[in-house]
Amino acid sequence: MEKYKLIALSGSLRKASYNTALLHSIIQLGEDRFDMEIASIELPLLNIDLIDPDEPEVVLSFKQKVREADGLLVVTPEYNHSIPGVLKNAIDWLSLEPGTPLRGKPVMIVGASPGILGTARCQIHLRQVFATNRTNTLPGNEIFITHCKDKIDENGLHDERSIRHIDKTLSEYHDWITFWKRNTKN
């Protein structure tokens, strides 16, 4: 089985983030199928004046990492029923034309929240944003970790049902990337 290179983003900057802990658990679960690198989304706020004549170096480096990856994994909380600002800012930087690294990129979205809906509303908005940028977001297979305070701690995800679901979805994501690599002209 071919191992794919993924860039992974945590939509939270919080040190004790449930989603960053979840992301580390996903990296361990998928290490037989993926080489994952967590990329920082601590980028300057998007300001078109900053790209005249060139984008900031930190943004260029971030975009290059995403461009070179076989896929993009996003693990995020939900803020105010939507996408955290820091994550939306990173996606906005990636979306700039010409040469967006998002077009055609296979994307998998995961999220954890203390509430009963997980990150359902955020993921709907992310799917809309990614569709606008012509990504190949994994259909179905939503992973909403609800009541995350009971399922994730400083050691990561410990809920067996969620672990099985994520492991199954990682296999489906691997197949999704394989499909797009075989059926997309570069």
Label the model's feature ranges:
Residues 2, 7, 136-186:
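Glycine-rich phosphate/pyrophosphate-binding loop and the adjoining helix
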Residues 31-37, 135-136:
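A generic structural motif
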Residues 11, 41, 112:
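Cofactor-binding loop segments of dinucleotide-utilizing enzymes, especially the Rossmann-like FAD-
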Residues 40-57, 152-153:
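N-terminal beta-loop-helix "entrance" segment that forms/cooperates
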Residues 2-32:
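N-terminal beta1-alpha1 ligand-phosphate binding loop
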Residues 55-134:
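Helix-loop-strand module that forms the ligand-binding subsite of alpha/beta enzymes
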Residues 1-2, 102:
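Short, flexible coil/linker segments at domain boundaries that flank nucleotide/cofactor-interacting
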